[in-house]
Regions:
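Catalytic alpha/large subunits of respiratory electron-transfer oxidoreductases
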Residues: 1-149
Length: 149
């Protein structure tokens, strides 16, 4: 939930610009950065955010480095007590969206510390999509069941 962002001590942003896509979320990330010394990593283009972050790569392929424990940011995620992954819908809607979502889900499962809090978050750009998902209006053709991961 958005409240959990304030408790995060490590956040991985994947293909997302929370400053423009979700200003309230960005304010919560900034609060975590200031209050919790939250470490933030970004995969995607360099951005002008309101807090410091470690730019990991412009390429979404870097997600494979993280899933294979070949990144320095893995140490940050492993040490974190409340890690979060925030995936932007623009990366999911790309040609490699299914792979990005699968890899993000696997990484989230690896770093999950609290069984009550799922570290994987999808930042939707359209509130109407969230409403549609809540009433189970979505494409039934999915290769994997992410709720079981």
């Amino acid at each position: 939930t958005i409240q959990e962002v304030e408790n995060a001590d490590a956040i991985l942003l994947i293909g997302s610009n929370p400053r423009w896509e979700a200003a309230v979320l960005n304010a919560r990330i900034r609060k975590a950065y200031i209050d919790n010394n939250c470490k933030i990593g970004l995969i995607g283009p360099k951005l002008d955010l309101t807090y410091n972050y470690q730019h990991l790569s412009e390429s979404l392929d870097y997600l494979n480095e993280l899933s294979n424990n070949n990144s320095d940011f893995n140490k940050v995620l492993d040490k974190a007590k409340n890690p979060l992954i925030i995936v932007g819908t623009s990366s999911i809607n790309s040609n490699f969206g299914t792979s990005i979502l699968e890899t993000s889900a696997m990484l989230a499962k690896k770093i999950q510390k609290n069984k009550d809090i799922n570290p994987l978050n999808i930042l939707h750009q359209d509130i109407s999509r969230v409403g549609a998902l809540e009433i189970n209006f979505y494409n039934k053709y999915v290769e994997n069941d992410y709720s079981k991961q």
